[in-house]
Amino acid sequence: ISLGTPFSKLLEMAGGVRDGRRLKAVIPGGCSMPVVHGNVMLETNMDYDAIAKSGSMLGSGAVIVMDDTTCMVKALERLSRFYFSESCGQCTPCREGTGWLYRVVKRIEEGKGEQGDLDKLDDVASKIEGRTICAFGDAAAWPVRSFIKQFRDEFQYHIDHKRCMVGSGHADDSEAA
């Protein structure tokens, strides 16, 4: 597709959201890029400036689409596990930080999260970002920071109720930008 194609057109060309579900979130440039609310992406063109304005980047160009059945905590746990397992271990912020991020997100996903975990995750991710030899540390930190920023209510629900908001009948349909 051409640069500048509306995301809504790209989604249509790809067959839409599976099973006619509601679009919840999109990672427009591969798993290392910040996540964007679905309603924002539906109004966004697939070009560098528009994606930057939405709060993300085109990155690798891989587009990850998540529907309203996606648990954002579980999605972040999977991404964090990848970065933890793939870190080369050469520099301390990435080696130690990716493991710490993964373990805390996993704990939240398992219903063992604690008050303050979200602020701690953001703080640790901010200390990895820009402090590693290569860009891998940034790639590990950006999803954590953006998932918490964009879907904090869902993460907080996991901590407060020890279970997922998705499928509980309490999912917040409001889409914060």
Give the location of each predicted region:
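Redox cofactor-anchoring modules in respiratory/redox and cofactor-processing assemblies
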Residues: 1-177
